[in-house]
Amino acid sequence: MTAFNPSSVRPGGLPTTIPEYLEHLRRSLAGADPALVQDALYDAEEYLRSELSENPGKSEADVIVSVAGSYGAPDEVADIYRDTEVKVQSALRAPAPKPRRSWMGHFFGVIAEPRTYGALFYMLLSLATGIFYFTWVVTGISLSAGLAVLIIGVPFVILYFGSIRVLSLVEGRIVETMLGERMPRRPLYSSRGQPLLKRIGELFIDPRIWATQLYFLFMLPLGIVYFTVVVTCLTVSLALIGTPVGLLLGFGSTLSIDDWNLGINGQPWIWPIAMLVGVLLLFVTLHIARGVGYLHALLAKHMLVKSAQYD
C-alpha cells in the first residue's frame, strides 16, 4: 500500500498522482464501513484512470486538477459518499420495530421483523450455495495444480482466481440482501496501468483471495448445519402445532414419535401442551435464525471484505 506523502500534494490541496489521491480519499474515509471504502476507492480509481486514458497527453496531476471541479477533491468525495450512504441505508433498511419493554415482547416480536425471514431463507439457501462454492473451489484448485505445469494451465489458473473475486461479490450481495450487513457493491479494482505479470502476481499474493476460498470451503459444512437445524426445528414445531388440529378434523388418528403416541382416544389433555411446545419451538427457531444470520454476516464481512487495506 502506498504511503501518503505530503510533498506530492499541490499547494491547493490536490494530490499529484492517482495513488496519492486514493490514499488521501482512504484517509478521509477513516472510520467508515470497509465495504463503503472499497466502493469509493473503486469508483474513484475507475473514473480517474478512464479520464487519464482519454487524455493521453495529460499527466496524472493535470487530470486530477481537471476533474476536481466535476468529481471533487478527496475530502469532498468522502463527504459525498458518507452522506449518500446514510440516505441509501435509510431507504433500504426495514422500518425499525417498536421498542418492546417486556421479555415476552422481545421473545414473540421476532416474528414481525423482516430480517428474521431473510436469515431463515439464507440458512435454507446456504446448503445449495455451500455445495456450489465447495465444488467450485475444490475443482478449481485441483485443476489449477494439475495444469499449472502446462502452457494451457496458466490462463486457466488466472481465470479461476478471477472467478473467485466475482463469486465473492455475488456472495456479498446475497449476504447484504438477506442478512442486512453492508457488503461491497464494487469489486476490487485491478489497475490497468500495471504490467500484466504484476497484475497476475497480485492475484496469488492477495490474502483476500485465499480468505474467500477458505470461506467458500467453510460454506459446505455450515450450509449442512444451517439447513439441518432449520428444517428439523421447523418440521417438529409445525408438526406439534398442526397435528392436534388435524386429529380433531379427522386427518388420521395417531401421531407417533418413537414410543410416544398422540391419538384421538389417547390423552387429549396432551394436545394443548403439544401445541404450546410447538409454538415455543417455532419462536426459538426464529431467534436461532436471527442469531445465526447476525454471526454469519460478521464472518462474511471479515473474510470477504478487504478491510485490512483500509485500517
Residue ranges of predicted features:
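Amphipathic alpha-helical segments that form the core helices of the histone-fold
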Residues: 40-51, 68-69
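Short, structured motif recognition centered on aromatic/hydrophobic residues
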Residues: 110-141, 174, 200-234, 241, ...
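Hydrophobic alpha-helical membrane-embedded segments
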Residues: 143-180, 279-287
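Juxtamembrane inter-helical linkers in multi-pass membrane proteins
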Residues: 173-200, 252, 301-311
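Membrane-interfacial helical/loop segments at transmembrane boundaries in membrane proteins
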Residues: 242-266
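Cytosolic/matrix-facing juxtamembrane and C-terminal tails of multi-pass cellular membrane proteins
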Residues: 263-271, 283-311
